[in-house]
Amino acid sequence: MTRKSLQRLIAACTLTLTGSAFAATELVVQYPYGGTFKETFAEIKTGFEAQYPDIKLNFRAPYENYEDATQKIMREAITKRLPDISFQGLNRIRPLVDRDIAVSLEPFIAKEQGFDKEGYHKAMLDIGTHNNEVYGLPFAVSLPIAYYNMDLVRQAGWDEHNLPKTWDEVIQLAQKIDALGDDVTGLVYGWQITGNWLWQAPVFSQGGSMLSADEKTVSFGGGEGQWALETFARFFKEGGMKNYSSADGQQSFYSGKAGIWFWSTSNVTKAEQQIGDKFEMKTNFFPSVKAGGTLPAGGNAIVMLTKDADKQDAAWKFIKFSTSGKGAAIVAQTTGYMPPNKKANEEYLTDFYRTHPNHYTAVKQLPLMTDWYAFPGKNGLKITQIIHDHMQSIASGDRMNESGAVLNDMVSDVQKYLPR
C-alpha cells in the first residue's frame, strides 16, 4: 500500500468514526391540534436543538384531536410504528398505561436532583400518575372559560363591569344580544370539544361526578346531571343558540357575529390574533360553580413511548425541556394554556399576565381544578361518543324538550359499556 493510499484510508476511517460519534439521535414526536400548537413547537424545536445539537426532532403531522391521538397510538402499537414521544390528552393517558404502551417516567425522575425546585410540584406530577407511577408530565393545562364580545355586550345594554356570574344571567344576556339582529347569535357553547369536556364541566361544577367511587355505576343521572343537561337544552330553547359545529361556532365569534363563546383557555392567543381590532374581547369565569364544585383540567401531557434505552435518554431531555419553566412559558405565551410548572408562573410569566389579563382569567380559576375524567376499560372512546350523540339529539332539536329522557337514555347506554 502506498503512503498516499494509506492516508486516504486513514482519512476515510476518521470521517466514518467522526460521523458515527456525532450522529444525531432522531426523536419522532407527534402532538395534537396543529392550528393551536404550530408556533409553540416551532419555538420549542429551535430552543431544544440549540441546547442539544446531538438530538434532532422530527414532528409527524399533528393529531386532529385527543381521540384521534389515542386511536392512532392504539393502532401503531400493533403495527410497531409508534412515535418516540406523544402528546396525549390528560384523560387519555390511562388507556395507554392499561395496555402497557406508555413508559413509566419514575426511573428518570428518581435520577433527578432537586426536581421539585425546578417547578415540578406534587399536584403537577399527580395529573399524569396512574397505578402510583408517573407516566405523563403535563405540558399544557386549560380550564373552561367564557369569551365575551364586549361591543355586543354594550350594544345589548348590559353592565360591562358586571358580566354574568350564573347561567341564568348568561341566557338573559344571550337573549338581548340575539335580539340585536338576524345575523347575530347570542351564545355559542362548544360542547363538541374533545372528551366530553364541556359535559363534565357543568356536572362537576355542581359537585357531581361521572361514575361511582368504585367506577361500576354511572353517577351523573342524579340532580347534578339533570341540571347540567337541562341547562344545555336551555341554551337552544331560550338562548337562541344554533346547532353549530365547533369550527363554525368558533368562527362566528371571531367574526363578531356571536356575543358569548364558551371554550377552553387554550384559544386565548389565537382568538386575540384572529379578532385583531374588529371588537374588544374579554374573558371571564365559567358560571355557576357552587361551593365544593370543581372544573376539569383540560390539556395534554407528554408520554414516552420508545423502549430503546438510547432514545429514552434523549426523550427524557426533551420532556424535561418542554415542561421546564422556560418551556412552559413558551406554551403560555403562544397559546392560552396555563403552565403547570410553578417556576414558569413565578419567574417567567409575572409581567406577561400583568399585561395579558385575558390569559390570567383561568389562572384565577386554578383552585377549582380537578382531573378530566377518563372512563375505565376498553370502551372509553365508545362511551365518549355515546355521550356526544345524546347531546347532539338535543342540539339538533330532535329531543330539545326532553332533556330528562335523554339523560336517562345516556345513563343506560353508558352503563352497558362499563367493565363488569
Describe each PLM feature range.
Residues T46, A50-Q51, K56, A156, ...:
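Extracytoplasmic/periplasmic substrate-recognition and gating elements
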Residues L90-I145, I171, L198, P202, ...:
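Hinge/lid segment of periplasmic solute-binding proteins
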Residues H130-F139, P144, D168-T217, E224, ...:
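Extracytoplasmic/periplasmic solute-binding protein
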Residues A24-G35, I55-R60, I85, Y135, ...:
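Short, well-ordered beta-strand elements
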Residues G47-Y120, T129, Q155-G157, N162, ...:
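Extracytoplasmic "Venus flytrap"/periplasmic binding protein-like
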Residues E26-E43, P62-Y66, S142, T194, ...:
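Extracytoplasmic "Venus flytrap"
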Residues Y360-D413:
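C-terminal capping/gating helix-and-loop segments adjacent to ligand/active sites or protein-protein/ligand interfaces
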Residues I171-D178, D214-N243, F286:
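Glycine-centered hinge/linker elements that transmit conformational signals in sensory
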